[in-house]
């Protein structure tokens, strides 16, 4: 019997068409100075264990069904301790944002002990603390009105995301759904 291929999938909430270009421009500018792979602006709402493509699509469809578009607000530009959380926009943990994360986590049977930290990554990179601080300052120089910025997340994307691949070349968007207003 042939073994069915299983992959790690992520569910991303995508910013609306109005705010996406602003984030892309900021990400592009940071990447040109500090290097790092290109990726679309997104807020990760769930990461699965290994799933087959069929399992992932079914879970994704059911997650999309029960979720409405929602608003997120930037708390501040922050830095993290690993590659995929190098420099990011930390989002306010409003009930709306936290419920969206919980909703998707439940549909994907995510059993994580880490509390949900909603954020929109600006840069994936291996930087020193000094470089991260510089990138953080640069983000504010490029866009001084980030703190308190509110934007809509109106789509979900199902993505195959092998976290071992730091080039992101194997990352693939499998499906996108528009959320009800």
Swiss-Prot record:
GO terms for biological process: tRNA splicing, via endonucleolytic cleavage and ligation. Pfam families: CPDase. It catalyses: ADP-alpha-D-ribose 1'',2''-cyclic phosphate + H2O = ADP-alpha-D-ribose 1''-phosphate + H(+); 2',3'-cyclophospho-AMP + H2O = adenosine 2'-phosphate + H(+); 2',3'-cyclophospho-GMP + H2O = guanosine 2'-phosphate + H(+); 2',3'-cyclophospho-UMP + H2O = uridine 2'-phosphate + H(+). Disulfide bonds join 64-177, 104-110. Substrate binds at residues 44, 121, 124. The active site is at 42 (proton donor/acceptor), 119 (proton donor/acceptor). GO terms for cellular component: cytoplasm; cytosol. Its EC number is 3.1.4.37. One of its GO terms (molecular function) is cyclic-nucleotide phosphodiesterase activity. Its main location: cytoplasm. InterPro entries: Cyclic-nucl_3Pdiesterase, Cyclic_Pdiesterase. Optimum pH is 7.0. It comes from the Eukaryota. It is found in: Cytoplasm. Inhibited by Cu(2+) and Zn(2+) at 0.5 mM by 93 and 87% respectively. Not inhibited by Ca(2+), Mg(2+), Co(2+), Ni(2+), and EDTA at 0.5 mM. Keywords: Cytoplasm, Disulfide bond, Hydrolase. The keyword Hydrolase applies. Expressed in leaves, stems, roots, floral buds and germinating seeds. Hydrolyzes ADP-ribose 1'',2''-cyclic phosphate (Appr>1) that is produced during tRNA splicing into ADP-ribose 1''-phosphate (Appr-1''p). Also acts on nucleoside 2',3'-cyclic phosphates. Belongs to the 2H phosphoesterase superfamily. CPD1 family. This is Cyclic phosphodiesterase.
């Amino acid at each position: 019997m042939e073994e069915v291929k299983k992959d790690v999938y992520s569910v991303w909430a995508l910013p609306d068409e109005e705010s996406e270009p602003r984030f892309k421009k900021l990400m592009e500018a940071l990447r040109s100075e500090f290097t790092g792979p290109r990726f679309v602006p997104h807020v990760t709402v769930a990461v699965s264990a290994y799933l087959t493509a069929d399992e992932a699509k079914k879970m994704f469809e059911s997650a999309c069904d029960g979720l409405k578009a929602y608003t997120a607000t930037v708390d501040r530009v922050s830095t993290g301790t690993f590659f995929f959380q190098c420099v990011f926009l930390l989002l306010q943990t409003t009930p709306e944002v936290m419920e969206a994360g919980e909703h998707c986590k439940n549909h994907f049977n995510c059993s994580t002990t880490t509390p949900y930290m909603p954020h929109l990554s600006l840069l994936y990179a291996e930087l020193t603390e000094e470089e991260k601080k510089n990138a953080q300052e640069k983000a504010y120089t490029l866009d001084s009105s980030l703190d308190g910025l509110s934007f809509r997340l109106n789509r979900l994307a199902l993505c195959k995301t092998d976290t071992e691949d730091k080039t992101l070349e194997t990352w693939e968007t499998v499906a996108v759904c528009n959320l009800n207003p």
